[in-house]
């Protein structure tokens, strides 16, 4: 009787293990489809005539999404399950260490990714990939600043664009839409402070723009 009970327990454990493995495989397959389709949409905007090159670029982009998720998941697991108890200062230090480790991993991954894309694409196409990975926020936001402030000097336009491009580099590595947009919000704050110090009133600029739209 005991042997039968043991055998049933073993079979039950094996069944649960197989079910968990199957669910994990299904989840991974679904994620692979999502990132491949996302990468395909980006590559579709690049005008690449060489099918093999298009596939290589697609795989680079999809691979970057996967590698970033692994870094983010590892970081979040450490932050969520391994926080040291007790002194809040120790907890903050631990959080900073975990985030710094993840950021260093992301930095290396980012540089490698851009270098590999640069070997396949023109600078203009590389920009398109970066915009595709960040919802096209740079060109949209830059156009908006030019609409609001038509009297910007060339130097001021360059400063606005430089800040947006820097934000884009960080946003490319962010894991969620909110995290990506947070990077742009941070840098838009810097831009607005810069423009305010140069004498521009952003609230008045919004009002002036609205007035220009009225017939």
Predicted regions and their residues:
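Charge-rich (acidic/polar
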Residues: 18-215
